[in-house]
């Protein structure tokens, strides 16, 4: 059964300690998790997709294993890039940011990413930011200079604890913009003084706007408290963003800010020479989520992301997306065969048990959960999903009792739901492939298949072959089987 009784206890690779550690929440049974969201000045890209899919699965697993999770994921809706883009387009910041917030939600829905419990916007939390900055100034770890307010990193003894960067070494090798207002080149801004043509808010230090780092500290502590369980994001945020968050929050509260820091690896793009390179607009290898969704179902992108361990670098290429689609096709083929026999597939809502049929490996679900408990090892979990699909195919080929077939199908649905995979109707999966909108409509395909079936019944093999070839030219693949002809798009 997929529930907390089968969990052997979660271990998490904690960036703070640089090792796997048993997960022990601060409050038994309850978990608070904050993940840094997107800066909404453009459409989200495949790197954003990885962060959101990874932490969506982590959230699902925490809930399935019995934890009462509060998941917070923010929007940065005030930032230098946002201001620049709004000015370029001659539109308000609110119009720009809301457009990309809406687009983000559409992209996430296509990827099967469930909404976070709380999705705060930075601009709606200015009072909390100002209060935190004021406390830091009162404690002597922040100072005002030239209309700005800065954090004095030398006054926080544990600066560098997350990234492992020693402050003296950073100063010696730092390539930072010269700012005469700073007491130390590594000091970072908490409040930016007002500039012409930029949004601004009144504050005790004059009109201006918040720095980037203070936003997450203020929102995290508001919704999860001065100390909480998990903080996550991409590896690129370890320094300086998350390092600065720790300095701000602990400098303000005097308490340990976060127990477990989780960071996913980078996304690299495989070039024509087969070499991995950093994804960037300048290299012309930049892919937005919606660009990819025009070519592949969102579930393909999700499977592709989860088929690598979240801490490993993720190599991106279209051939790898094709391999991901082929993997999902294998699972849906097994489910389609079961559906043809049973008439209807059993569903498994999250949280409900998924039973292992008699005679099957009784430890399959336990091993699946062990993989997920072991630092959220989704590639290994997917391997067990394939094992279940293999067992379903075997049960069908050996003409097992329909109850056994139904149980295996239910198990696949249950494991898949845990990962956000294999939840679609298998017929719809195969009929809504790439190019479905531009190609033959389903009704036309069904009509041609009916004509072909009549030709086959009349032993008119030439007509049967002609219809098959016509459909093949439209990217439609036919499979003749015991239960009739099934079709899918290439």
From Swiss-Prot:
InterPro entries given in the database record: Cys-tRNA-ligase, Cys-tRNA-synt_Ia_DALR, Cys-tRNA/MSH_ligase, CysS_C, Rossmann-like_a/b/a_fold, tRNA-synt_1_cat_dom, tRNAsynth_Ia_anticodon-bd
Cofactor notes: Binds 1 zinc ion per subunit.
UniProt short sequence motif 'HIGH' region, positions renumbered to this chain: 38-48
BP GO terms, sorted: cysteinyl-tRNA aminoacylation
Compartments it resides in: Cytoplasm
EC code: 6.1.1.16
GO molecular function: ATP binding; cysteine-tRNA ligase activity; zinc ion binding
GO-annotated cellular components: cytosol
Domain of life the protein comes from: Bacteria
Keyword terms, alphabetized: Aminoacyl-tRNA synthetase, ATP-binding, Cytoplasm, Ligase, Metal-binding, Nucleotide-binding, Protein biosynthesis, Zinc
Signal peptide: none
Keyword Phosphoprotein listed: no
Name of protein: Cysteine--tRNA ligase
Sequence motif 'KMSKS' region, location on chain: 278-282
